[in-house]
Amino acid sequence: SGIFWQRSCNVIEIFGFLEGKTPDHRGRILAMLLQQTDHQAEATHDYIQCLFPLDEPSRSVNGAPVLTELDIDEIKESILAQGNLAKSASWFLGFLERNQHWVTKYDHNHLRITRVIKSLRLLASDKAADEFKDKVFGYLGDDLNLIDPKARSFWNSA
């Protein structure tokens, strides 16, 4: 399968990673990333691009995977990859629900939320992306206005 991510002399095969079979550039398999503590998830900035790859370069992590049409087709057809995308989305929603530090005008987790919505829309379905987005807005409730309108706009258009 297609795209490789080269960084620090390491290579990741994104399709195999999303199927839970091959490690990322740090030797972590998908299941390991989903077992991170909230502190690890907050302090580590290169895993979200592996869990939720896109067909465009990351502005945050140089060298992050950029999906090809072949990658997208393979991921869409893979029961394992689809299941792992759903698990990853659920895990990240849990992280957001347990932590409130992102409920502020500017936070790097706002970019992560946009990436997850875009990736789910690209690789899973509009329904999965919209359900994720709706849960994020639901977590915010009365605090919705604490989030920068530009971030909310990105979420709505992702």
Map each language-model feature to its residues.
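N-terminal leader regions that mediate targeting or early regulatory function
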Residues: 2-100, 117-120, 127, 135, ...
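Alpha-helical bundle/repeat cores within regulatory domains of eukaryotic proteins
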Residues: 95-158
